[in-house]
């Protein structure tokens, strides 16, 4: 019964997130004469930043400049970015208690002044040629000061393919895009993978400098924009943006441990909710393994099949292989474990290492 109820709940939330109104619509390459300055914060992204910059230079929106902010890379990131055609700026060393990525974004915003809009795009993101124009059109149509497309996770390893689509479904279950878009409701979210913001709104809330101590600077900036009365637009765009954040399982674990407690919460209630979600996913299969009588067996089978349908549907929405939905119980267990580790680090102040930097105060002001 628990598995059946969880499946119905997940199906309803997936349908809400995936319906047409939350997908990025067509854009206008002219975008009403708007111009965009693009900032790419990059730390040790050689082998990725070139593709990112090439895609940005091919945008059909009015991209006025592409500035790559090299955040102390040691692998040739700056050389690759410059060779591809970007202007390269060196980020100042972050002050104690200041997140490296937030500091790099803030520096980029200071030096990229040609556009009326700012776009912050991670170096591991590749955008389709129409991505920025469609996002800009959505923001203009809604009267929004900022927006983000929710990108497809480009995966190569089995662990990435197993975990990241299920993580996306877990995020979709928590993320109410209607509430984010409603200026009368406090819910706020933007994705730093690709974040478009009007320059005057960005400056008006203090930009990334004002949230430089936050572990999740994109969500913190979204909160400041929403509190200042600005509208936000977040749309599904799996065909317009692709990101590959993690190359190894260890990187995946560290990256999620860095963020999950900040995004989902470090309290007992959200952790218990995730544990209950995991238990509900396992419940129908454990019940079937116990060989119950026919009525209970039918309920358990229905719950299990519904869970599989939801997970396969979530993978299709995310542009991932639906066949790996059969391994969702394992994915749920791993995600619960990494979330518990993230909460532990947040509560105890355990150090976190990310991109070669160690943030000792895990319970306070960290980031990267």
Predicted regions and their residues:
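Long helical/loop segments within the catalytic core of UDP-sugar-dependent glycosyltransferases
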Residues: 7-10, 90-108, 134-204, 253, ...
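Cell-envelope/extracellular polymer assembly enzymes that use nucleotide-activated donors
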Residues: 34-37, 65, 220
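Acidic helix N-cap motif at the loop->helix transition within catalytic regions
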Residues: 47-51, 75-83, 130
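A conserved acidic beta->alpha catalytic loop
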Residues: 55, 62, 70-79, 93
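Acidic donor-binding/catalytic loop of UDP-sugar-dependent glycosyltransferases
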Residues: 76, 123-138
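Short aromatic/hydrophobic "clamp" motif used to bind/position activated sugar donors
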Residues: 118
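Catalytic donor/gating beta->alpha subdomain of glycosyltransferases that bind UDP-sugars
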Residues: 139, 148-171, 200-203, 208-270, ...
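Membrane-embedded multi-pass helical conduit in multi-pass membrane proteins
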Residues: 271-350
């Amino acid at each position: 019964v628990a598995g059946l109820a969880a499946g119905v709940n997940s199906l309803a939330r997936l349908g809400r997130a995936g319906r047409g109104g939350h997908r990025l619509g067509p854009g206008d390459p002219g975008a009403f004469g708007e111009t965009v300055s693009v900032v790419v914060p990059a730390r040790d992204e050689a082998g990725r930043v070139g593709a990112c910059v090439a895609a940005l230079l091919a945008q059909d929106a009015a991209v006025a400049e592409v500035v790559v902010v090299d955040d102390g890379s040691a692998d040739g990131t700056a050389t690759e970015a410059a060779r591809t055609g970007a202007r390269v700026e060196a980020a100042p060393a972050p002050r104690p208690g200041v997140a490296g990525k937030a500091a790099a974004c803030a520096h980029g915003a200071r030096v990229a002044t040609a556009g009326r809009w700012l776009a912050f795009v991670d170096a591991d993101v590749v955008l389709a040629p129409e991505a920025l124009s469609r996002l800009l059109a959505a923001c203009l149509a809604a009267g929004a000061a900022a927006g983000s497309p929710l990108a497809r996770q480009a995966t190569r390893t089995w662990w990435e393919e197993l975990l990241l689509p299920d993580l996306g479904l877990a995020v979709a279950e928590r993320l109410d895009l209607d509430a984010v878009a409603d200026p009368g409701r406090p819910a706020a979210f933007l994705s730093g993978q690709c974040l478009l913001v009007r320059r005057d709104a960005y400056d008006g809330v203090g930009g990334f400098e004002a949230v430089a101590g936050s572990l999740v600077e994109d969500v913190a900036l979204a909160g400041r924009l929403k509190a200042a009365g600005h509208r936000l637009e977040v749309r599904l765009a799996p065909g317009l943006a692709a990101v590959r954040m993690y190359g190894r399982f260890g990187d995946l674990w560290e990256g999620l441990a860095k963020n999950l407690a900040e995004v989902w919460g470090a309290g007992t209630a959200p952790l218990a909710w995730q544990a209950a979600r995991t238990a509900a996913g396992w419940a129908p299969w454990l019940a079937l393994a116990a060989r119950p009588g026919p009525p209970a067996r039918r309920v358990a089978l229905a719950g299990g099949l519904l869970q599989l349908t939801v997970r396969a549907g979530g993978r299709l929405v995310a542009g991932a292989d639906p066949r790996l939905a059969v391994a969702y119980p394992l994915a749920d267990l791993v995600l619960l474990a990494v979330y518990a580790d993230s909460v532990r680090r947040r509560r105890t102040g355990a150090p976190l290492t990310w991109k070669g930097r160690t943030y000792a105060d895990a319970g306070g002001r960290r980031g990267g």
